[in-house]
């Protein structure tokens, strides 16, 4: 199977850069520092108007754990309907029980809304209690792929687990490595694990055009980030990653 590179895109512009670099598809997210949250309908619509490659949208209403209230599930169902109406090809989600198991009721509701779309179970997988059992459940319920760092802080640290999951999957579901994948380690991951799907942001920082600055003021209150630069996917970095994967 051909190698696939999914770009975690934080904006419509990053989606454009991903396509220019030759990415297979994008996962469109807001709130990247929080692990990704659902982007606005406006961002989705603009992204769809700019690129032809598939767009998968994360369905995650907030940061934090993956145990959701009934109100949050209702919002997630609504977001899936919006994603479908805007012509996106797939959605990315995952709901857990308080014990770290597969939440049958919550996931079933989302799966029903997403019928006919591409389905990715996101890195909620990495904090589940029994990953090998969870993998079988995802296969049985119809997910097309699972995004995972191998239940480790980064995919490189979890490469042995990723390889084991890929062996267990045996082509029944895609195993897509994500978290900390860079130009310097993507080949190592590919050769060590045997997987063919990779998820990376491949971003660089774009300096702000603001000339007047008040750098001591942060919009995040207690969470301090650089307000005068923004991360954006680099078409050149994507192209380099594609070339590396094609050479394996």
UniProtKB/Swiss-Prot annotation:
This is PF03932 family protein CutC. Belongs to the CutC family. Its main location: cytoplasm. It comes from the Bacteria. Signal peptide: none annotated. It is found in: Cytoplasm. Keywords: Cytoplasm. InterPro entries: CutC-like, CutC-like_dom_sf. It holds the Pfam family CutC. GO terms for molecular function: copper ion binding. One of its GO terms (cellular component) is cytoplasm.
């Amino acid at each position: 199977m051909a190698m696939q590179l999914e770009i975690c895109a934080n904006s419509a512009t990053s989606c454009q850069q991903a396509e220019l670099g030759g990415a297979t598809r994008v996962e469109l997210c807001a709130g990247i520092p929080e692990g990704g949250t659902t982007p606005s309908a406006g961002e989705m619509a603009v992204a769809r108007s700019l690129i032809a490659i598939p767009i998968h949208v994360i369905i995650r209403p907030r940061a934090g754990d993956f145990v959701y209230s009934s109100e949050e599930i209702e919002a997630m169902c609504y977001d899936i309907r919006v994603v479908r109406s805007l012509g996106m090809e797939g959605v990315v989600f995952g709901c857990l029980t308080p014990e770290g198991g597969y939440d049958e009721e919550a996931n079933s509701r989302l799966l029903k809304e997403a019928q006919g779309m591409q389905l990715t179970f996101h890195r909620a997988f990495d904090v589940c209690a029994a990953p090998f059992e969870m993998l079988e459940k995802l296969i049985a319920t119809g997910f097309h792929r699972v995004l995972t760092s191998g239940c480790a802080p980064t995919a490189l640290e979890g490469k042995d687990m990723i390889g084991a999951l890929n062996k267990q999957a045996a082509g029944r579901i895609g195993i897509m490595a994500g978290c900390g994948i860079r130009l310097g380690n993507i080949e190592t991951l590919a050769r060590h694990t045997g997987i063919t799907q990779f998820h990376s942001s491949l971003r660089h920082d774009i300096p702000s055009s603001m000339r007047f600055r008040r750098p001591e003021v942060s919009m995040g209150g207690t969470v301090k980030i650089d307000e005068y630069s923004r991360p954006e996917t680099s078409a050149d970095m994507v192209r380099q990653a594609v070339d590396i994967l094609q050479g394996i």
